[in-house]
Amino acid sequence: MVREKVRVSTRTLQWKCVESRIDSKRLYYGRFILSPLMKGQADTIGIAMRRILLGEMEGTCITRAKSEKISHEYSTIVGIQEPVHEILMNLKEIVLKSNLYGIRDASICFKGPGYVTAQNIILPPSVVIVDNTQHIANVTEPIQLCIGLQIERDRGYRINTLKNFQDGSYNIDAIFMPVRNANHSIHSYVNGNEKQEILFLEIWTNGSLTPKEALYEASRNLIDLFIPFLHAEEEKLNFENNEHKVTLPLFTCHDLLAKTKLKKKKKEIAFKSIFIDQLELPPKIYNCLKKSNIHTLLELLTKSKEDLMKIEHFRVEDVKHILDILEIEKHFP
């Protein structure tokens, strides 16, 4: 573990890694500071970085498995200790590292008896396993276990409603997010007559990249979002020229209603793409929502106060905490 005493500049804006450690092959931690910032800037940057880290980072994982020995997801295979469903869940947990794009094929071909682990996966050259010891199955008899795998790189979650196909392949719910969690906090102080802030940013990753690499990538992604505004400034459009003149049509009540419906539809699509991982939820509330199959902000917004109270282990203060968050989120444009 590396930890540094925090010393901040009073003039030049700079960032620094003040703590880093490797808790396991699949859990890296880093703590960073950015200072000095003017009042309000730390929260602006912290919220944006956290959303990018949890929602926009790309990762690689197994998204489909196929085997002739599998009749259905909840079946068992003679000579294998785990049921098929558990094997698929173990494959879902395998952490991969790559820069591939598109779909790649991989496979497992194991002769029992013995333990099948991540190191038994035959991968394309562009893909690396982060933890070779991850358990997949226990083959208890001298049989051949062959599984075809599909690997993809994407972002966020992919919850598959269609689980199995006629060719004997099974979709696996994919968690592409390489960042397990991200938090930010703010320390305010007075420098002379000026109020300033220090932003503390904590990042946990799954080992496919370090927290420092995640910070770099998230920063690039955030910068890319603002580049179009810079280009618009550089173009310096001449609106005095006739070719740039636009005649605005008159709106009717029907047009206004249609526009309102379209805006509502766009908002629903936006909420559908925001996962509850991107909300600042306590671990207990987050876990209860996931167990209730609530994965997105849209799914959360459709729940009433009474629906939330029916969730197992939920208390009144938990529901109030969620309602406070929803009150903020639903006003986003």
UniProtKB/Swiss-Prot annotation:
MF terms from GO for this chain are: DNA binding; DNA-directed RNA polymerase activity; protein dimerization activity
Which positions carry the signal peptide feature in this UniProt record?
none
Q: Which reaction does it catalyse?
A: RNA(n) + a ribonucleoside 5'-triphosphate = RNA(n+1) + diphosphate
Listed under GO cellular component are:
chloroplast; DNA-directed RNA polymerase complex; mitochondrion
Q: Which GO terms describe its biological process?
A: DNA-templated transcription
Answer whether the UniProt record assigns the keyword Transferase to this protein: yes
In short, the EC number is: 2.7.7.6
Q: Which UniProt keywords apply?
A: Chloroplast, DNA-directed RNA polymerase, Nucleotidyltransferase, Plastid, Transcription, Transferase
What's the chief localization of this chain? Answer: plastid
Its subcellular locations are: Plastid, Chloroplast
Q: Which stretches of sequence are listed as region Alpha C-terminal domain (alpha-CTD)?
A: 266-333
| Positions of region (Alpha N-terminal domain (alpha-NTD)) | 1-233
Subunit comment: In plastids the minimal PEP RNA polymerase catalytic core is composed of four subunits: alpha, beta, beta', and beta''. When a (nuclear-encoded) sigma factor is associated with the core the holoenzyme is formed, which can initiate transcription.
Q: What is recorded about the domains?
A: The N-terminal domain is essential for RNAP assembly and basal transcription, whereas the C-terminal domain is involved in interaction with transcriptional regulators and with upstream promoter elements.
Role this protein plays: DNA-dependent RNA polymerase catalyzes the transcription of DNA into RNA using the four ribonucleoside triphosphates as substrates.
Family statement drawn from the similarity comment of this UniProt entry:
Belongs to the RNA polymerase alpha chain family.
Q: What is this protein called?
A: DNA-directed RNA polymerase subunit alpha
According to its UniProt entry, this protein's organism is Lotus japonicus (Lotus corniculatus var. japonicus)
The gene name reads rpoA
